[in-house]
């Protein structure tokens, strides 16, 4: 489906016979085919001939003998044509109904008035609408009225949307432009046109992009299209960080951003610190929507603005101020333990003064106990899949591969002595536990075996942000010896589309029961 789509909508064919009967009664005399009728109308029909000739005055009959030989020759030539199929395009019944009954309003038995316009329609067609079916079959006073004034309380509905909605009752297909789909959906929901509602949903799902996603998401929350809402969330999870956009940041509301940041399916680029940076830029644009700079300028302008706020609020954490309180519920979904595990990131988040120090203190304590367990308590990593732990507490990180080639990288941060090296080569994605073979700035664990829980996802997108291809390992437990390599995904590089995006979830150490999690209880007011 491109910018528009179509869907077959059922029509009451019984109504067709009733409406066409009147149209035929008004028609003038038909054109005759043969015999005396033909003569009276000035036409001559010659058997075997292909032409009808108009006479001047009375009918002039043809001499069959004069044409016999010619007809025999033509008959021989035309014999093959008798066995050759031919097509003749007939006028569509649906088009006839739409033009004659809807656009022209012939044989109308009811007039619908709304938004300063009127439509001459037919009750038998309107009964396809749940709204009008109830009106005409119930005890409403409108059931016996010939003129009905419709009140339109929904501001999304306009005259053009009503035109499409009413017209859908008279035709087999409806073309819906993405720019008009929200208004048409609103009209379809009001009139209870299930077929048109479904088609609007399909149009939305096929045309989600950076310009439409927020408008679609808002509208389907109102009108209850859960499948479209799910598609919008999937698009946002995939594109929020991989294809950052100033306009998108401005349009994303607090509730939807809370869902995105809290999800383990967020396609993170780089590390959790970049999730924090994305949130910081988004919050700035929510507070200063008039800013119209470029994406490259955004982070610098954001840091300057929050620096001024720190001075104005005398060192108070921004999320504790009145302007910052509405954003608390979103920032609580940050996985702070993976930010403070890197020195540079820990310094930045402390200096920004956005997150309250109490939040950070509890995470420092939690990570200190986890480090002691890894060093002194024979902790070798997760031994079984705990989906709740993985989805709520795993490290989120990612990488963009611009083109095919060989890549070697590791993500920053202290991971309890587990130095994981990621390799992409010839369509293989390999995890290697680095201990002695590669240089390492921090300490590494020399335990014979270490285990991690992980999930790897791979994706590529088209220009609209739609998923072109994707692969996932699902959640797994991987046990590696010192300097051991393990292929975790095998791809056919001939069929890969670049740039390629790789996103991983890791859990290096199991959360200890009884130790407070870094996730803060939700404030009901937020």
Swiss-Prot record:
Residues 1-85 are annotated as: Disordered. Expressed predominantly in testis. Pathway: Protein modification; protein ubiquitination. It holds the Pfam family BTB. Residues 108-178 form the BTB domain. Residues 62-77 have a biased composition (Basic and acidic residues). A motif (Nuclear localization signal) lies at residues 49-55, 85-91. One of its GO terms (cellular component) is nucleus. CDD domains: BACK_GCL (cd18495), BTB_POZ_GCL (cd18305). One of its GO terms (molecular function) is cullin family protein binding. It is found in: Nucleus matrix. Changing residue 275 to A: In a colorectal cancer sample; somatic mutation. GO terms for biological process: germ cell development; protein ubiquitination; spermatogenesis. Keywords: Developmental protein, Differentiation, Nucleus, Spermatogenesis, Ubl conjugation pathway. PROSITE patterns: BTB (PS50097). The keyword Nucleus applies. According to some authors, GMCL2 is a GMCL retrogene on chromosome 5 which is likely to be functional. Interacts with CUL3. Possible function in spermatogenesis. Probable substrate-specific adapter of an E3 ubiquitin-protein ligase complex which mediates the ubiquitination and subsequent proteasomal degradation of target proteins. This is Germ cell-less protein-like 2.
């Amino acid at each position: 489906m491109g910018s528009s789509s179509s869907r077959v909508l059922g029509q009451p064919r019984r109504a067709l016979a009733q409406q066409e009967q009147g149209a035929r009664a008004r028609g003038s005399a038909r054109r005759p085919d043969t015999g005396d009728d033909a003569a009276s109308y000035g036409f001559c029909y010659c058997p075997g001939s292909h032409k009808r000739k108009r006479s001047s005055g009375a009918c002039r009959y043809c001499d069959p003998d004069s044409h016999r030989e010619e007809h025999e020759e033509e008959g021989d030539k035309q014999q093959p044509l008798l066995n050759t199929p031919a097509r003749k395009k007939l006028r569509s019944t649906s088009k006839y109904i739409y033009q004659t009954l809807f656009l022209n309003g012939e044989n109308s038995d009811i007039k619908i008035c709304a938004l300063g316009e009127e439509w001459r329609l037919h009750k038998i067609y309107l009964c396809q609408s749940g709204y009008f079916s109830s009106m005409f079959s119930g005890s409403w006073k409108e059931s016996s009225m010939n003129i009905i004034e419709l009140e339109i309380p929904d501001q999304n509905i306009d005259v053009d949307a009503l035109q499409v909605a009413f017209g859908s009752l008279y035709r087999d297909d409806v073309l819906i432009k993405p720019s008009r789909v929200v208004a048409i959906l609103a009209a379809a929901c009001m009139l209870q046109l299930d077929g048109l509602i479904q088609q609007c949903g399909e149009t939305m799902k096929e045309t989600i992009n950076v310009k439409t996603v927020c408008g679609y998401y808002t509208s389907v929350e109102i009108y209850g299209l859960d499948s479209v809402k799910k598609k919008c969330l999937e698009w946002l999870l995939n594109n929020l960080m991989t294809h950052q956009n100033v306009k998108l940041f401005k349009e994303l509301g607090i509730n939807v951003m809370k869902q995105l940041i809290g999800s383990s399916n967020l396609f993170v680029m780089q590390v959790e610190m970049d999730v924090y940076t994305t949130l910081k830029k988004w919050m700035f644009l929510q507070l200063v929507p008039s800013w119209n700079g470029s994406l490259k300028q955004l982070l610098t302008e954001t840091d300057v603005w929050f620096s001024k706020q720190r001075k104005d609020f005398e060192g108070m954490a921004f999320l504790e101020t009145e302007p910052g309180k509405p954003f608390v519920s979103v920032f609580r979904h940050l996985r702070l333990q993976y930010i403070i595990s890197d020195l540079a990131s820990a310094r930045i988040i402390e200096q920004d003064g956005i997150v309250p120090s109490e939040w950070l203190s509890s995470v420092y304590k939690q990570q200190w106990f986890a480090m002691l367990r890894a060093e002194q308590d024979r902790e070798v990593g997760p031994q079984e899949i705990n989906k709740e732990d993985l989805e709520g507490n795993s490290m989120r990180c990612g990488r963009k591969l611009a083109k095919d080639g060989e890549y070697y990288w590791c993500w920053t941060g202290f991971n309890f002595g587990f130095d994981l090296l990621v390799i992409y080569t010839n369509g293989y994605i390999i995890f290697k536990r680095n201990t002695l073979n590669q240089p390492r700035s921090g300490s590494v664990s020399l335990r014979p075996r270490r285990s991690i829980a992980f999930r790897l996802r791979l994706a590529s997108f088209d220009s609209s942000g739609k998923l072109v291809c994707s692969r996932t390992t699902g959640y797994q437990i991987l046990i590696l010896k010192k300097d051991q390599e393990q292929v975790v995904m095998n791809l056919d590089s001939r069929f890969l589309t670049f740039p390629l995006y790789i996103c991983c979830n890791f859990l290096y150490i199991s959360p200890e029961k009884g130790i407070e999690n870094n996730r803060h209880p939700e404030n009901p007011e937020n």
